[in-house]
Amino acid sequence: MGFLNTKKRIRIMLIIILILLILLLIRLAWIQLGQGKKYKEMAEKQQNLDREISAKRGIIYDRNGEILAMSASSEMITVNPNNIPKEKKEIVARKISEILEIDYEKILKKVTRNSSIEIIAKKVDKEKSNTLRQWMLENNIDQGINIDEDTKRYYPYSKLASQIIGFCGTDNQGLNGIEAKYDEELKGKKGSISKTTDAKGKNIGDTEEKYIGAIEGNNLELTIDKNIEQIVEKYLEEACIDNKCTDGGNIIIMNPKNGDILAMATYPNFNLNEPFKINNTELESIWDTMSSEDKNNNLQAMWRNKAIADTYEPGSTFKLVTASASLEEKITDTDKKGEFCCTGGIEVGGVRIKCWRYYRPHGSESLREALMNSCNPVFIGLGQKIGVEKYYSYLEKFGFLQKTGIDIPGEAGSIFLAKEKVGPVELATISFGQRFEVTPIQMATMLSTIANKGKYVKPRLVKAIINSQTEEKSEIEPEYKNQVISEETSEKVLNMMESVVSEGTGKNAKVEGYRIGGKTGTSEDGVNTGKYVTSFIGVAPIDDPQMVILVTLYNPTGEGGHQGGGVAAPVAGKIFAEVLPYLNIKKEEGENKAQVKVPDLTGKTIKEAEKILKENNLTIQLDEGETNKEKIITKQIPEKEITVYEETSIIVHTN
């Protein structure tokens, strides 16, 4: 009986062993046939020691082919700890530390690790790497230390357009600005150096290295003009320092015909070749004592592109939107005499909103005069006639209710009340540019729309992508959207803006020989902060606009005050004076004409005025439908004593 049980147990064990063998064979077959490729790749990876070769990042050019960012040759130092003899590890670590000026303990830790490869340093200057090569040669070290080609980003103009261009990290990845936005185009494809090693990562005999070259990244052509950017940055820095602008400033110059950003400056800027070095001397002195969070916050603020990332109340510059909508809706016209009357304020929803010149009201005004005087009550009244629904449709069409989509990271959106929450008082304040916030790029785009015969054009910073291998250029076409206002309305608004510069609050932006239009603005930076934002928005030449400019200065505290006409307009004037000739925009033929002072026509009849103007080689422009030559003139544009060219038309209004 016991014998039979033993035989039975043996039989069962044999069956189990047979089943296990069958399962093992099935498993081996599955590994060989189904997973063979995978394990082969894993084995090859384990036996091959790969070192990366950085791709040369694409060049960034300005619109005229000037290099703004490029990749200079440098080298990367790596070590293979398993290929460095134990007795030489300390010597190697000390010498590398000495040559590369890196902490000895950190290098020793890497050299003594049980690993096949360790990165010691990237972007090493040729001078240092050649010194290391020479030492290796003199000490017969032919393995364990690798010196491979690498690239280092270099910015020839240092601080120029720093917040636009951006910068790269240690792995050549774009971290900010255009470098980040177009990283996929610029970065190229990495190469590699491969060598077969044993299980411990040591070289096997004289096996040759396998080299796969890196592929360069594509190049970019920006819309920025280096020379215009330099002019703009020069005057922005001067303005911020002279006017003691505690929170800096920004300037945008845009071509209204195609959306090209010719210049976009933020002050203060920073050195692109040292992007992690703070640009503030006070902060620099306490930098080492600051927390990591505080350091990061200050660096983020330094890198911030105010022109697209900051919002502000535009103030009176926004009256251009109200004027455009009013003209487009046929609510008013530019020169209807006595259409409006400023009494120093206006009652809205039980609240009296004052004109800035409440102490000496403007009195009888046309729309042109109201814009020249920057009279709040007139624009409040126009806003009431337009109505919330229609006004918000214009905000939408002008692009204020969404981001512009400009091709750079970090763009902020505007801050408006929801349409349903806008009451009479809220509409009133919107009408003259307060109690909401927009970005500078939205404002520049708005004026570009007006200057582009009323058609919206999207702002852009990149004109073309150039293939680094074939040099084929892929142009990026301008993007046009809706017709916001008619060409007729566009001409009227531009014409009124010219009056603002020739005789109104924007006089300080005037440049002899050029027809320039503009609008000044001043607003509080927040509620009851005691801080102000001052701005000037302008366009030239009026008859064929080639450039739109927006100057925005944050909290000027200097002796010049904080009014847009006194602080921001002069900056625009200096820039117009240099940029317009640079763009080959010739001065008006009138520059060669004789100049005369406008005579005083007030108190005279139209008939008498015609005679006086004829004697001075000037002409007269009457109110529409005016035929009575005996009427007395009560107001004239330009005012008396203003210098103009012969044949200029003088606008007159009667009582």
What are these language model-derived features?
Residues 1-283, 311, 389-397, 509-511, ...:
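Periplasmic/cell-envelope proteins involved in peptidoglycan metabolism and beta-lactam response
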Residues 67-69, 198-211, 257-317, 321-553:
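Beta-lactam-recognizing serine transpeptidase/beta-lactamase-like catalytic domain environment
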Residues 106-116, 152, 245-258, 341-347, ...:
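Acidic/histidine-enriched alpha-helical segments
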Residues 142-144, 246-249, 335-337, 403, ...:
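Short secondary-structure junction motifs
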Residues 158-160, 256-258, 349-352, 629-635, ...:
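A short, glycine/Asx- and small/polar-enriched loop/turn
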Residues 187, 332-333, 603:
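Glycine-centered C-terminal helix-capping/turn motifs at helix ends
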Residues 238-242, 295-296, 499-502, 581, ...:
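Conserved helix-loop functional segments at active or binding sites
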Residues 513, 551-655:
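Ligand-recognition elements built from short beta-strands and adjacent flexible loops
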